[in-house]
Regions:
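Conserved hydrophobic/aromatic beta-strand scaffold that supports enzyme active sites
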Residues: 36-38, 49-53, 70, 92-94, ...
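Double-stranded beta-helix
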Residues: 106-134
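A short, N-terminal "cap"/entry segment at the start of jelly-roll beta-barrel domains
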Residues: 1-46, 130-134
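Short beta-strand segments in beta-sandwich/barrel cores
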Residues: 59-60, 76-80, 92, 122
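Glycine- and acidic-residue-biased ligand/ion/polar-headgroup-sensing regions
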Residues: 56, 65-82
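Short, charged/polar surface micro-motifs in flexible loops or helix N-caps
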Residues: 44-46, 55-58, 77-79, 99-100
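Short acidic-glycine-tyrosine-enriched beta hairpin
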Residues: 81-100
Length: 134
């Protein structure tokens, strides 16, 4: 291993943490029945990775991302009102840039937890596709 590579690998220590914490204080309230657990917040390139937790009956309002989003369901299940599929544990989800969707956890599901890898902003839209918040 080159000296430069060795120095680079030693400059940043490993980070190993329990992804789904027992400590409720690590979940950040986002909206009614919705919490997130930040894992990575990269202010250089706008990348973020988090766990999203939504309780039964929870709805993440209509929103869009300007860049791709990748998700992996760890617990429970959820769906988008705009699609006819249901994401269940082990499901990998790709959201194309610019798609507007509404994430729903149905009443019969206790809660869902999904790992999301996001690039860029998140904008919320009304039913006329007008930006209302970002």
């Amino acid at each position: 291993m080159s000296e430069e590579l060795l120095q680079a690998t030693q400059a940043i220590p490993d980070l190993v943490t329990k992804a789904i914490p027992d400590d409720e204080r690590l979940w950040v309230p986002q909206a009614d029945k919705i919490w997130f657990r930040p894992l990575i917040l990269n202010t250089t390139n706008g990348e973020w990775v988090n766990l999203l937790r939504i309780a039964k009956g929870g709805v993440m309002n209509r929103h869009r991302h300007p860049a791709p989003v990748y998700g992996y369901v760890l617990k429970g299940e959820w769906r988008y009102l705009e699609h006819d599929w249901v994401a269940k544990p082990g499901t990998f989800v790709f959201e194309p840039p610019g798609e507007i969707h509404t994430l729903v956890v149905d009443e019969e599901v206790e809660e869902m937890i999904t790992l999301f890898h996001v690039f860029g902003a998140l904008g919320y839209y009304d039913e006329d596709d007008t930006l209302i918040q970002h």
